[in-house]
Each structure stands twice: as C-alpha cells, then as structure tokens.
Design a protein with these regions (language model features):
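A short SAM/SAH-binding and catalytic strip from SAM-dependent methyltransferases
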Residues: 132-145
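A short acidic, Gly/Pro-enriched loop at the edge of an enzyme's catalytic core
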Residues: 121-132
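N-terminal auxiliary segments of SAM/dcSAM-dependent transferases
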Residues: 2-27
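Conserved Class I S-adenosyl-L-methionine
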Residues: 194-288
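Conserved catalytic/acceptor-binding region of the Class I
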Residues: 146-147, 153, 157-226, 244, ...
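Class I SAM-dependent methyltransferase SAM/SAH-binding core
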Residues: 67-122, 147
C-alpha cells in the first residue's frame, strides 16, 4: 500500500508568490543610455554596418521624392542609403554627436539631408508626416519600447511603411547582449532590446499593421582577429565601453574571456581572423 502523503504542519503557512520585480525608472534608464551612446565613437563601428541600411531601403522599395524619417539614426547608415535613392530624408537621434557623424558623411557625398536632435519616444513631427520610417539597430535600444513603436506608427502616413533592422536574441549580437548582461545586469524589469528581433514582439508592438514581413538576414563581422574585434568594440562602442568601466579588474578579465569564447563559438574563420555571421530581422511593416 502506498504511503499517504503527510499533511504540512498546521503552523506552516503556504509560501507567498514571489513579488514581481519593480518597474524600472525609464527616465533614469534613458539618461544612462544617452551617456553610453555618447561615449566612445559609435561611428567607428557603425560605418561597418552600412550594407544593412542599403538592403533595408531596397526591401522598402523606396521611391525618389518619398518623405523618409530615420529614427535613432546613429551615424546615418539608413539615412545615407535613403538619400542616395533621392528621398527627402530627415535624420534624427537623441545624441547630437552621433548626428554630427551623419552630417559629415552626407556632406562628403553632397547629399541633401535634414538632421534634427529628436527622441524616438517623443518625435516632434505631425501625424502621418512621412511615407516611410526607418531604424537600423536603433529603435530597438529604446527604454520604453511601446512608446517608441507608437511614435513611429503615428508619424507614418496611412499606406506608408516602417522598416527596421533588429538583432535577434539567438544571433551573435543578441548573445553579446546576454553575455554583457550576465556581468553587468540591466535594471530589473527592463525588456531586452533583442526582443525586437522576434516576430512575436513585433506583433505586440505593432498590433495594427496590415502586414509584417520579417525575414532573417545575416550581417558578417570581419575583423583581423577576435582580439581585434574586442579592442575596437571595447574602445569605441559606448555600451561595451561602459560595461567594462563598471567592472573591477577581475570582472573585466572575466567578461573579456566570455566574449572571446562567444566569438570562438560563432567564428567560421580558421585562419586566425574573425568572420562571424550575426542574425537580424529585416522588418517591413505596412500601415493600413
């Protein structure tokens, strides 16, 4: 006969469910993010991603004369790609030093682009002001994801399109985020930017889209060696620079080891160089 289960002692109350983590102070998070993106020089890294802006503009089938807004534009990869297609482009970011790099690049190519400091979570434009709204690896880093998505949707005209390039959680860059977060945890309750690289999250952020096309693409990081990639990102990529600066010496060494191990897992080169494909979603949303 099976032994009956013993009843819990009468004086032992059932365990209370764990309290949810407190909501992060998004204003504080945003200011920290602004400080991170203002440090280093993102353009050193960002210009290597130019091809992503070009292919996104092709996916959107941009036409000459279209009113195009690039949000969280950084050093202007999508901005320049749209301007090269003779679109009427407005390039925005909340970090003016990043826009300065975009201005320099546009001037070098004699491209006519309007640059304006603006936060994607509070865009200073009228409803439906643009035919297309773009962001390559930019809007995904906003503190308030729902508000950023709502603002992009608002300023896009009916019948217009929103184009995004977002790193996936399982790809190389998504795993870089995860590795850094294991050493320098983000504020409790803050959503990962890599969620923008999932169809499920896109459907949540843009519930009224007439269609969402989000094929998986791959950008290939090519560097002299894994150590070369780490040196470049550690010196110039603001979020990584800040992460290393926040750690003691042994913590910095541990993060370096983990990042190099991650590169080794993704690296397809066997000649000492670094050739690492990184998945991202190339997103085209249609607004009815």
């Amino acid at each position: 006969m099976p032994t009956p289960l013993a009843a819990p002692p009468p004086d032992r109350a059932p365990s209370a469910p764990a309290a949810p983590p407190p909501a992060p102070d998004l204003a504080v998070v945003k200011e920290r993010q602004r400080g991170a993106w203002s440090s280093g020089d993102y353009a050193v890294v960002g210009t290597t991603l130019q091809i992503v802006g070009e292919t996104l503009c092709e996916a959107l089938d941009l036409r000459a004369g279209s009113r195009v807004l690039d949000v969280a534009a950084g050093n202007g990869n999508a901005t320049l790609a749209a301007a090269r297609r003779w679109c009427d482009v407005t390039s925005t970011d909340y970090v003016e030093s990043l826009l300065d790099r975009g201005r320099e690049r546009a001037a070098a190519e004699r491209l006519d682009v309007a640059f304006q400091v603006a936060d994607v979570e509070a865009l200073p434009f009228d409803d439906g002001a643009f035919d297309a709204v773009l962001s390559t690896f930019g809007a995904m880093f906003t503190a308030d994801q729902e508000r950023a998505a709502a603002e992009m949707w608002r300023v896009c005209r009916p019948g217009g399109r929103i184009g995004l390039a977002n790193w996936t959680p399982s790809g190389f860059v998504g795993q870089v985020f995860r590795t850094i977060g294991a050493h320098v945890p983000p504020p409790p309750g803050l959503r990962s930017p890599a969620l923008w690289g999932t169809p499920e999250r896109l459907a949540e952020l843009f519930p009224h889209a007439a269609s969402i096309a989000a094929p998986t693409r791959s950008f290939v990081f090519r560097y002299r060696s894994p150590a070369h990639w780490l040196d470049i990102f550690r010196a110039w990529y603001g979020p990584m620079l800040k992460a290393f600066a926040a750690l003691p010496e042994d913590g910095r060494a541990a993060l370096e080891r983990d990042l190099l191990a991650l590169i080794d897992r993704f690296n397809v080169a066997r000649d000492g160089t670094m050739v690492v494909p990184s998945e991202y979603l190339e997103v085209v949303l249609a607004k009815p």
